[in-house]
UniProtKB/Swiss-Prot annotation:
One of its GO terms (molecular function) is RNA polymerase II cis-regulatory region sequence-specific DNA binding. Belongs to the Antp homeobox family. This is Homeobox protein Hox-A7. Keywords: Developmental protein, DNA-binding, Homeobox, Nucleus, Transcription, Transcription regulation. Residues 213-229 have a biased composition (Acidic residues). A motif (Antp-type hexapeptide) lies at residues 118-123. Its main location: nucleus. One of its GO terms (biological process) is positive regulation of transcription by RNA polymerase II.
Length: 229
């Protein structure tokens, strides 16, 4: 077959299709011999004739839903803006006034509320104030017991190291060791008196130099504690 067969077949197909749309209106894309091709003249004319009919509020297309559905016409939706505009300045002024009032309240009451805040270091440390019992965690107690097993008395440097390691204060470490020493002495005193009673002719034991040093150090610690308070 020659190529002319395909050309003639396609041409006949398009001409047959065009016969179906003989009554269709020419659009801006049609290229009739008498059509104007300068600018957008034909296109503007085609759309100008259809747009008013579709988007006109007064057309029957829009009148029928208003009348049948709500019993209202198109005029009910064309409300004037004056009734709303006259309330806007007052509304805006009220909102601005409320915001200003709130800002003034924050400025006035902010420092007053901040002044009522009491931090731990601001609390009074008078003799009338009752101190709560310090509670130690299991880990802190275990570490303190291990330290007490090796050293019943701590130097200032070692006390600071333990305080930093256990997240405690030097005062808490000091008080814990004081209480632990008193408990240890009481336990050993009871153990020494429990087995046998002291004979009547027995000479009272003389305190050793170590016991005296311990007592003097305890007295010094108590004096330091009173001075700190």
């Amino acid at each position: 077959m020659s190529s002319s067969y395909y050309v003639n077949a396609l041409f006949s197909k398009y001409t047959a299709g065009a016969s179906l749309f003989q009554n269709a209106e020419p659009t801006s894309c049609s290229f009739a011999p008498n059509s104007q091709r300068s600018g957008y003249g034909p296109g503007a004319g085609a759309f100008a004739s259809t747009v008013p009919g579709l988007y006109n509020v007064n057309s029957p297309l829009y009148q029928s839903p208003f009348a049948s559905g709500y019993g209202l016409g198109a005029d009910a939706y064309n409300l004037p803006c004056a009734s709303y505009d006259q309330n806007i300045p007052g509304l805006c002024s009220d909102l601005a006034k409320g915001a200003c009032d709130k800002a003034d309240e924050g400025v006035l009451h902010g420092p007053a509320e901040a002044s009522f805040r009491i931090y731990p270091w601001m609390r009074s440390s008078g003799p009338d104030r009752k101190r709560g019992r310090q509670t130690y965690t299991r880990y802190q107690t275990l570490e303190l017991e291990k330290e007490f097993h090796f050293n019943r008395y701590l130097t200032r440097r070692r006390r600071i190291e333990i305080a930093h390691a256990l997240c405690l204060t030097e005062r808490q470490i000091k008080i814990w060791f004081q209480n632990r020493r008193m408990k240890w002495k009481k336990e050993h005193k009871d153990e020494s008196q429990a087995p046998t009673a002291a004979p009547e002719d027995a000479v009272p034991s003389v305190s050793t130099a170590a016991d005296k040093a311990d007592e003097e150090e305890e007295e010094e610690e108590e004096e330091e504690e009173e001075e700190e308070e």
